[in-house]
């Protein structure tokens, strides 16, 4: 979970947080995730074939700029239990930014006594001094703690 990730970062870095920022993946990555997930559920795990199908689709052709995303996402999906995969397929695309903002803002405030900022990777005015947003993947947001 995101809270576990925050706790692990704090444990490793031993910093006392002043601000926590979470970056969610941009829209095309969510579409690509769902396409990769569908491929896996249909038995297709060949990265080359998956990349080819993503590039052929107008909504996910941006994968050309980040082919490593497919490998990481495929590994994410394959490491998850089958039931979770099926559940995510049923749900389809979600607004991670909205969900994280509504579910974690007060929790972070209570647990760490700091503000939580949530940005989409594609937000033009996002605060991202360490260029973390680009590493965000669906269900695997990037985290910056200052």
Feature names for model-found ranges:
Residues 1-146:
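Feature 926 captures the class I aminoacyl-tRNA synthetase adenylation module centered on the KMSKS loop
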